[in-house]
């Protein structure tokens, strides 16, 4: 990127001043860039973002090793999503099996989401300290075992207990998977790869819906879907064993072996000291990301978890029709997340999220009012195109906002705390819909799932817009060379490659000058 441009004012200080500046930057096409020369002198300029690149050329930038890490991370996230949606799309079957209400069944979803933040903290910190490989392997194996335990839960109470424990281990997947996948991708390709990666969640839903369609609508058929989920999770864990640790941790171990004198303070104590320093420095960013993830998790769970139930009850579809509608809906999510994640590398992370959320609001009438399978499938496709389009930006956005040494725990914990806060979303939708009735197109009195989901989604989408507009953005931040947390803070070999990597700096060496560029380093 060129180091010349129109002079810009320095980054504002303070929460409100920074928010005001970030909001103003949203309406300027050029990016605010901080340029630091070899003497530590900084200037700020406006620069046009790099032109949008052909996605094929971006794919070509990834080496075979990069693709390996990315695909394993994608598969882990897909398996995690399959395990979660295996329950949400079979709410009606499970309610019949345990002879209880659909609202009571969604209590299991609430418990799963409540405990995911604890798992994210535990497995995220372990992954940041010891590496991405074995924490993810153990995590996936335990998820598979708990899927099997769900099948054999004899009572509703036992079912809830297993799903609560399931949530604890499910929480550890997201942070490790996206950190492993994106930290090994070239910077220019991260927007596109983020969009594809996030759609592992939607693809997991599609696979679960296909499995549900394949096993039929009988009550006991839900067990077959859980068996498939167990095999998928255990299989991904076994697959991860075949590949090495992330290169950052291999490099750190090599450097520690060659220069033990530089790592005398490394260890658990140094790791926790780094954690405390990070929290003191980044607590505002942490709170912002939790608020953002709360909105986003409400956004996805409200618009999708009860969608199959909506088709079955309000629209009176049969199991096959509802499954086909759900599959097409999440196919739209896969397409939208990939395209909008890719575009975010050019138009900006915040603009991509805001425009997607706004368009999804406009589509709500078309999403809930039609009565035929074709119409609802088409509107569901485009609704989730933009819902998950906004979501497609999240993996790279969270990684760029994260302290670089905590790229597994920070995104994982903030995402899962947002999940925890939004955990009652499906339960709220079901409770309101089951207690509110409307007359459908056949003049029959039915539960009002459509209006409930529509009103809630409008409120949530507007919340996303209001939260994102004044928020921070670090598009283009380079975090792949960050020092490993707990390594004593003396790894000069790595540290000298980046001046202040937590502010999103990248290194550009041109001629005799070494210039350090920071893109959109707005603070939370």
Show where each model-derived region lies.
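Cytosolic juxtamembrane N-terminal segment immediately preceding the first transmembrane helix
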Residues: 2-89, 96
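Residue-level signature of mid-helix packing/kink "hotspots" within the transmembrane helices
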Residues: 85, 113-121, 206, 330-338, ...
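Extracytoplasmic gate region of multi-pass secondary transporters
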Residues: 87-88, 282-337, 422-426
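Helix-breaking motifs and short loop linkers at transmembrane-helix boundaries and internal kinks
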Residues: 99, 131, 152-158, 186, ...
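Conserved MFS/SLC helix-loop-helix module at the cytosolic interface between two early adjacent transmembrane helices
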Residues: 118-156, 347
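C-terminal ends and interior cores of transmembrane alpha-helices
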Residues: 141-154, 358-372
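Glycine-rich segments within core transmembrane alpha-helices of 12-TM secondary carriers
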Residues: 189-217, 232-233, 412-426
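Central mid-sequence intracellular linker of multi-pass
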Residues: 190-192, 197, 216-280, 410, ...
